Amino acid sequence: YVLDAQRHFVPDSFDFVLQTVGIYTNVEIMNKACVILQDKLASFMQSLDSDIIPILHSETTIENCYDIVLENEDYTLGKVLEYLLYEKYYANEKIFTFCGFKKFHPHNDDSTIRIAYENPTDKHMLAQHLRTVAGEARDIFGKIRTFFQL
């Protein structure tokens, strides 16, 4: 607390510097990045609807725990989903007891989101929660993209 007394900051505000080597302008890079992320999220939602995304019971001591395996995905998609799941279902609605993301090794193509529920829950409810936050993330990147329209 003592060290935070003199600290002035805006919560959840991040400043980035984007530099280019000249092939694309900064605005084009941001626009393309938002489009790619929106497409990834749409593909993720389709995979959820088709039951392609592996949702496994976690082999941990945490009760009501599931692992969502993100195949061929890393921090870009995983941390977005983890953050939104955490904010919505852990911090606000308090139906999660745990929410975390891990990529076990840089050479692995897969990463894992681990979620634990307060009460016993089936995989369909988990898939619905994932679908909800993926839709929210897609909307967020759509809003960000409007700032970088050409």
Language model regions located:
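Protein-protein interaction/assembly regions in multi-subunit complexes
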Residues: 1-150
